[in-house]
Amino acid sequence: MTLQLNTIALLLVILLILGVLSNNSAITISAAVLLIMQQTFLSSHIPLLEKYGVKIGIIILTIGVLSPLVSGKIQLPDLSGFLSWKMALSISVGVLVAWLAGKGVPLMGEQPILVTGLLIGTIIGVAFLGGIPVGPLIAAGILALLLGKI
């Protein structure tokens, strides 16, 4: 087996290093898995990840978000809780963020190079500004809004 030393491999190594430096396990693990896949016989499965990866990731994320409800850690509020202005605002923000993320998916497909910029921006925000990684889908949705794609 010979290593493929190409631009994509270099980018994945850089993302891996930035992920480690910024303590961002999602970036670190993703870059490591893709680098291993690219450099081994697993490369034939990359088109499957490309086709279904975002959908599978969203399903896993949704399971993670809903699991506290199922486990009982989070209780549903009573009717008066749903009628408060804070609940109405939180629902509205949730709708806006979901809509933005939905607009980000096509942009990521149309211009995948922008994903690299979004990831680098996220890593910089985490490493130097004390931010937390909120997800490239939402960032891509905001970018789509700024680029006039919406």
UniProtKB/Swiss-Prot annotation:
Superkingdom: Bacteria
Principal subcellular localization: membrane
Short name of any one Pfam family annotated for the protein: DUF441
Any one Gene Ontology cellular component term annotated for this protein: plasma membrane
Transmembrane segments: 1-21, 52-72, 81-101, 123-143
Keywords, alphabetical: Cell membrane, Membrane, Transmembrane, Transmembrane helix
Record's subcellular location: Cell membrane
Membrane topology qualifier: Multi-pass membrane protein
Similarity annotation: Belongs to the UPF0756 family.
Name by which UniProt lists this protein: UPF0756 membrane protein CGSHiGG_08995
Organism: Haemophilus influenzae (strain PittGG)
The organism's taxonomic lineage, starting at the top: Bacteria, Pseudomonadati, Pseudomonadota, Gammaproteobacteria, Pasteurellales
